[in-house]
Amino acid sequence: MLTSKDFRDQAINLIKKWNNIIDEIPWQWNQINELNNESKGYFTTKRYHKINNNNNNNNNNNIENKNNNNIENFEEIKETIDDSSTTIIKSNNNNNENNIIIFQFDIIYSKSYQVPVLYLNGFSSFDSSPLSWNEIWNNLPLSNLDKNQQSTIPYITQVEHPILGNPCYQLHPCETDNLMKLILLKEKDYNDNNDKKEYFKDYYLLSWLSIIGPMVNIKIPFDLLKNNNI
């Protein structure tokens, strides 16, 4: 389990390190102060992505059935995702605006599950209109993994944003805790100089994001993973 304090501390540290490596499209921490004086927040970023038109017709009929499945083999996902599928694409050419979409990613701490949860939305870069679920799904690497039956994963459901209140999509966190226990114990074998508690506290969020990120077009900087032995 991850505490809310650990989440905040790790998020702020991760944002600083990430933005020092890649600052074109930075992460930022949004602080929220509630009426009961409880302080909380979340971190957020955007990614610009070239529209994938190849799979639209093939995927549309199967989307509903695909999203009723769950995930089991996360390590296979990490090994099989092609980095080219998560390339950030930016364009200042107005003629290309219709071919670029914007993904908005928010990572928020869940008190119920005591784990980080990823929320996402997609928008047109041309007029900022929200994308349909089909348009979002067809442009996520996750859709290709599902189609090829390479693994099963915690699937995306439509929910209300827990802080902003707008409709968005959530990568369901029900198996996150079990997943992270396995990953952190495995990574602990390579970090004999750290006791279990310290390693858990320092690397939980980055380890989680290194698995979840490539599924949704978030490419983790190699130097960030290398410097933290992930």
Swiss-Prot record:
Subcellular localization, as worded in the UniProt entry: Cytoplasm
Active site (catalytic residues): 174
An annotated GO cellular component: phagophore assembly site
Example GO molecular function: ubiquitin-like protein transferase activity
Main location: cytoplasm
InterPro entries: Atg3/Atg10
Primary role: E2-like enzyme involved in autophagy. Acts as an E2-like enzyme that catalyzes the conjugation of atg12 to atg5. atg12 conjugation to atg5 is required for autophagy. Likely serves as an atg5-recognition molecule.
Gene: atg10
Name of the protein in its database record: Ubiquitin-like-conjugating enzyme ATG10
Family label: Belongs to the ATG10 family.
The protein's Enzyme Commission number: 2.3.2.-
PANTHER family: UBIQUITIN-LIKE-CONJUGATING ENZYME ATG10
Keyword annotations of the record: Autophagy, Cytoplasm, Protein transport, Transferase, Transport, Ubl conjugation pathway
Organism: Dictyostelium discoideum
Biological processes per GO annotation: autophagosome assembly; glycophagy; nucleophagy; protein transport
